[in-house]
């Protein structure tokens, strides 16, 4: 089976989500040699890389360039909207190049990658219930895209029963689609 994981958050300073992505991907690679894993950094790679980790030995010129570009965008918030539109168009183009059996989106909002099944992790809904805890640009993006894109998911994983309950109430979807991991 061909499985793709969105690893774009690994190009930035690692947060809780970034660390979760990195460790989950590493564990899958070690525990599951039967499937073929792809990692999406804005390009598809069969290598798990994490430029933000000082111990990462598999960095390359492309990942370093993307890490630098992501840092530039982070330092210039006024560009984020324009860059986000360009990224969205690029993801749609890249999505047409490959198709996967499973797409795992570990960061709330699935991209337009082509896969037979989509699994998305929602860690919490604080962006809805506590927007003051989040950067302004995230609060501008999440409400616009979350509900529409999460609907693409065949399965939604939540970090807790509490978050699962919030998802079921908010999204009004079948209970069998939302699971706690």
Language-model segments: which ranges?
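Carbohydrate transferase catalytic cores enriched for Leloir-type hexosyltransferases
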Residues: 1-181
């Amino acid at each position: 089976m061909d499985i793709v994981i969105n690893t774009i958050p690994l190009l930035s300073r690692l947060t809780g989500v970034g660390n979760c992505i990195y460790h989950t991907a590493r564990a899958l690679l070690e525990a599951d040699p039967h499937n073929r894993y792809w990692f999406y950094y804005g390009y598809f790679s069969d290598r798990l890389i994490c430029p933000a980790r000082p111990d990462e030995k598999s960095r390359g010129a492309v990942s370093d360039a993307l890490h630098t570009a992501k840092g530039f965008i982070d330092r210039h918030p006024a560009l984020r909207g324009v860059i986000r539109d360009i990224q969205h168009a690029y993801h749609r183009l890249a999505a047409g190049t490959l198709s996967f059996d499973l797409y795992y989106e570990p960061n709330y909002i699935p991209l337009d990658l082509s896969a037979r099944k989509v699994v998305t992790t929602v860690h919490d809904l604080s962006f809805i219930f506590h927007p003051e805890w989040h950067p302004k640009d995230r609060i501008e993006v999440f409400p616009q895209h979350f509900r529409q894109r999460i609907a693409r998911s065949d399965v939604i994983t939540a970090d807790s029963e509490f978050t699962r309950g919030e998802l079921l109430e908010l999204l009004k979807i079948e209970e069998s689609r939302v699971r706690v991991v």
